[in-house]
């Protein structure tokens, strides 16, 4: 497959949107309304005086440290050149490399989009159900303060909260996610749920968050999980950046509407810049979600995206189907919904899961 460079992505007009979208530096506020400057150029900057042992529980004292600083300039989505970036890759199966941890190779995938309501959580939840039914040991981390994935997967809650992953790993690992005695290689689905304290992660420096979260991902790998799926908030914050730095793959569901499409260049640039520090990160691509086949605007936008980003569009789409919403509300995958209308949705979601499973080269 080809390579899409950051500079190339920026030169392309955004189909259905403002050609200038994403061309300027963007300001992002955290949940407390604090302002951080996000820029595309440069490397990740170390924040002077950071305490690597701090967790989000003590994050309030760190607000002044991060306010007004250019946190991790290498992951900013804004105006900047592409010199030195390795680009966003859509490699062929078999070309990726994952980190071996003990005897277990855990694959980590992040669903990310800087626009909400595009089917990101729905995609992640159905991947979790599909992989679980394949007999895999699946960890799901909900880093979205909205907690929608946590709601759907509440029957699989471990009692471990996502905010804890921005703190030190206990000496013996997290007992909440450890396999029960005798489970061994048995399939399991373990939810690390969102909680209100998670918002404090945005107060950490990115260097702290990256190290702490990365160490916790390695701890999960040591507990025998085959795959870790991470849902993220629809904003470019510390939580999303830390997840991308720890991930092997990233998938971006998109809605075929102008506002959603406008964020594509920013997401592509963010991923390209993260790859400067996390070379193993692979962009699986964009998957059109909530597609209305009867809407000519959706058809036009999809054709424009395919023309603009032919190597970055996943050959699978998920339609706008009420049965998917029914499934999410019921805490089950759409193929468990006993409605005729759910059959087509099930086929689409399963096709997407097959594609992602193949690209991730997950061993069974």
UniProtKB/Swiss-Prot annotation:
Pfam families: AAA_31 (PF13614). Residues 1-63, 75-102 are annotated as: Disordered. This is Protein IncC. Keywords: DNA replication, Plasmid. The keyword Transport does not apply. Belongs to the ParA family. Gene3D superfamilies: P-loop containing nucleotide triphosphate hydrolases (3.40.50.300). This is one of the proteins encoded by the trfB operon; it is involved in plasmid maintenance and replication. It comes from the Bacteria. One of its GO terms (biological process) is DNA replication. Residues 1-10, 26-42, 89-100 have a biased composition (Basic and acidic residues). The keyword ATP-binding does not apply. InterPro entries: AAA_dom, DNA_Partitioning_ATPase, P-loop_NTPase. It comes from Escherichia coli.
């Amino acid at each position: 497959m080809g390579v899409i460079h950051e500079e190339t992505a920026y030169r392309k007009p955004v189909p259905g949107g403002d050609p200038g979208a994403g061309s300027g530096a963007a300001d992002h506020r955290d949940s407390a309304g604090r302002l951080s400057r996000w820029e595309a150029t440069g490397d990740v900057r170390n924040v002077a005086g950071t305490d690597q042992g701090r967790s989000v529980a003590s994050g309030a004292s760190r607000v002044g440290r991060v306010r007004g600083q250019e946190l991790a300039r290498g992951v900013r989505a804004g105006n900047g050149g592409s010199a030195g970036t390795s680009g966003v890759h859509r490699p062929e199966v078999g070309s990726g490399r994952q980190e071996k941890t003990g005897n277990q190779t855990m694959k980590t995938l992040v669903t990310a989009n800087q626009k909400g309501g595009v089917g990101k959580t729905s995609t992640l939840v159905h991947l979790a159900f599909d992989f679980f039914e394949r007999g895999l040991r699946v960890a799901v981390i909900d880093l979205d303060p909205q907690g929608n994935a946590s709601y759907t997967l509440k029957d699989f809650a471990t009692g471990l909260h996502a905010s804890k992953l921005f703190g030190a790993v206990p000496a013996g690992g997290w007992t909440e996610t450890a396999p029960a005695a005798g489970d061994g290689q048995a399939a399991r689905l373990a939810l690390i749920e969102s909680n209100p304290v998670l918002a404090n992660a945005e107060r950490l420096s990115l260097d702290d968050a990256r190290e702490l979260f990365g160490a916790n991902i390695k701890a999960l790998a040591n507990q025998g999980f085959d795959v870790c799926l991470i849902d993220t908030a629809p904003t470019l914050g510390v939580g999303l950046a830390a997840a991308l730095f720890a991930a092997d793959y990233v998938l971006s569901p998109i809605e075929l509407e102008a506002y959603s499409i406008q964020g594509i260049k920013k997401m592509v640039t963010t991923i390209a810049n993260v790859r400067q520090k996390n070379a193993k990160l692979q962009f699986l691509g964009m998957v059109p979600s909530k597609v209305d086949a009867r809407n000519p605007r959706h058809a036009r936008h999809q054709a424009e995206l395919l023309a603009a980003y032919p190597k970055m569009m996943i050959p699978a789409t998920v339609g706008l189907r009420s049965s998917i919403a029914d499934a999410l509300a019921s805490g089950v995958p759409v193929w468990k919904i006993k409605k005729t209308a759910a059959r087509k949705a099930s086929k689409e979601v399963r096709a997407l899961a097959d594609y992602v499973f193949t690209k991730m080269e997950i061993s069974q």
